[in-house]
Amino acid sequence: MSDNVSEGLLAEPPFSKEAAVDPATASHDRGAGGQATTFAVVITSYNYRDFVLEAVESALAQSRKAVQVIVVDDGSTDGSDALLREHYAADERVTLISGVNGGQLSAFQRGVNAARAEVICFLDSDDRWEPAYLAHLGALYDTRADIDFVFSDLQLFDQQDRVMKFHDHAVDLGYTAISTYVLTQWYGAPSSALSMRARWARQALDLPDSFQRTWRLSADNCLVFGCSVLGAHKYYLPTGCVRYRIHGANGWWSNESPRLEYINKMTSSALIQHYAARVGMGPECIEFSKLEFMTKPRPPWKETKRYVRLVMMRRVSPWRKWERAVNILRRGWRLRG
């Protein structure tokens, strides 16, 4: 789970104004073939014997069924692997993968490699979903073929009780490559609220072996930063269906400190630079900030101000900076979501 909870390359997709999607009324048809989007769930687990069955059962209990529920046990030493095999070895709905401990990035890669669905959803083994979660996602993915990456809000439970959210309502974020590259902006959520089309998960997790040690924890950064910089079209969809457990043994939550925050910022910056190098992205991309902003149909006011900051960082005359900033402010105010 990542400690970046806050508030790709350009094209011209057919945007529509965003709205919360009702899974009860939205069609599951997509495209001329009328096929519903297929989902695979990747659950990664390490020494969470007390919680992992609850996570798996929540994935199996979805009103819209996943075609695969893949559980990757990352070398647990607390009997988790045996417990999983006791319950699911004969269950055709569940694919069990086990091996030596390699960390979260390695577990993500193993799970994604086994996925055979169009969209991959991630679930940490100490969290759980409400039964309508995949139905909410499916209603969006089915009707918006241009959307690549969707993240949700989270309801904290156990030792805390509050909601973590990006915005008050659904937001079509368009493209986020430049904002991520220049500002290290994090457009995402912890793993259990992340989903993306399979090709984006594979691209984001296609990393050198040397990254395994760095991202033993907080590998959701690889998904969030990678998909942004590589060019995914992102969407925030509050579902109210993701339960995020705070229990004192969370990988990073229980170990926050200024030192770890510093290390996370530095490693995140290096990660972003790696993805940028793959697509030939450099500092000159800031000149296209306005174009990226134009891909957002109804940007929240905070997002508008973020892009004003970007255009003011351009190496041009003050007059040209302000001219573009005013244009962004006008558009953002008119369309604000």
Residue ranges: model-predicted function:
Residues 1-18, 284-337:
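Membrane-interface aromatic/basic loop that binds lipid-linked glycans or pyrophosphate carriers
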Residues 258-300:
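Soluble, non-transmembrane catalytic domains of enzymes that act on hydrophobic metabolites at membranes
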Residues 44, 51, 178-199, 282-296, ...:
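Short N-terminal secondary-structure initiator segments
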Residues 1, 164, 196, 205, ...:
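Detector for methionine-enriched segments
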Residues 129, 178-186, 242-249, 266-275, ...:
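Short, surface-exposed, charge-dense and proline/glycine-enriched linear segments
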Residues 52, 92, 132-133, 204, ...:
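Short, isolated positions within intrinsically disordered regulatory regions of eukaryotic proteins
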